[in-house]
């Protein structure tokens, strides 16, 4: 029945399908419309006109497909399943998802704008104050022979600092701590400064 049924018009296919359905179910001709109407009413969204289902293109394709596949037991349950297969899938709009994404993106952009705000930079350097600046004539000596001679240029340097800063030697000690790197020389100069502070020189 496959190829002759395909060549029929829509009305012819409907009549042929209904005739096969009644023959398979063993129904009489007058019982066919009522039973078909009750069987087709199980499908949701199927239009009904005057107590009978309106056989549109969807129902025609359902009946044709069932009999082209050689189905002999065409019941109301088969009709419902076929109609569900032929129903167009519902297209879910992305408005809700886009709305949520807009809020998330907006929050993300706001956060990035806050993060891009310039932050106050912390001052660098010595927190206690700028390093001591010395006049050119009081720069640390670079011509020490490191032999321990009595006329050491570092001793002369310490005496010059004591004469410049009349504060009891504290400023001179601070300058020596900053400019002298050798620990032995630093200890020697601290001792010389304290001796001169005690002697009042």
Swiss-Prot record:
Residues 102-134 are annotated as: Disordered. InterPro entries: Oxidoreductase-like_N, OXLD1. One of its GO terms (cellular component) is mitochondrion. It holds the Pfam family Oxidored-like. Residues 134-161 form the Oxidoreductase-like domain. This is Oxidoreductase-like domain-containing protein 1. The gene is Oxld1.
